[in-house]
Amino acid sequence: MSLTQLQERIEDLECKLAFQEQTIETLNDALTQQQLLLSKMQDQMKYVVGKVKNMDTSTLADPAHETPPPHY
């Protein structure tokens, strides 16, 4: 292999490395954003579950005492 060919291969590898570094950085940013969103969604889910668990079921009518819907 000639010196020129080796230099071309090195330049090609350097270009590929730069592209891979940029891709990794982009993927890392996307992963970070998704992790933040997931954490926020988990907090919201915990809040909703807590609200549902603390619902006062005494305010709900007993289905046996409700009048049937008009289609019956």
Curated annotation (Swiss-Prot):
Intrachain disulfide bonds: none
Family: Belongs to the SlyX family.
HAMAP family: SlyX (MF_00715)
Name of the protein this chain belongs to: Protein SlyX homolog
Species of the source: Vibrio cholerae serotype O1 (strain ATCC 39315 / El Tor Inaba N16961)
